[in-house]
């Protein structure tokens, strides 16, 4: 059973996913790499998603393990503690490939 807290977190994750998708949907990887605003917005929202994922219950993470929640949390930590050394190619791939998948899975869980 999905708890109220986990449900609220999923709704916030979806909101953050939407922001990332919106920011990268009409630009190329090159445009992204040259646009500091886009990189900052995407990284901020990835940071937020990781923080939210860290608040999910242990039971939730065990039950809904199709997504690598620990990697999401790890990316958040990498952004927070190593912003100057972030590989923006990885950030781009995450934004283009993983974030839509995460959004879809969260929506699936919520029904």
Predicted regions and their residues:
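Solvent-exposed interaction patches of small proteins and small membrane subunits
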Residues: 1-111
């Amino acid at each position: 059973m999905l708890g109220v807290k986990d449900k609220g977190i999923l709704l916030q994750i979806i909101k953050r996913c939407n922001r990332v998708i919106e920011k990268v949907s009409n630009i190329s990887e090159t445009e992204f790499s040259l646009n500091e605003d886009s990189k900052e917005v995407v990284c901020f929202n990835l940071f937020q998603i990781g923080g939210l994922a860290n608040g999910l219950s242990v039971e939730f993470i065990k039950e809904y393990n199709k997504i690598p929640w620990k990697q999401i949390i790890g990316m958040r930590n990498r952004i927070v503690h190593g912003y100057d050394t972030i590989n923006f190619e990885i950030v781009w791939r995450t934004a283009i490939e993983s974030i839509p998948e995460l959004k879809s899975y969260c929506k699936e869980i919520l029904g």
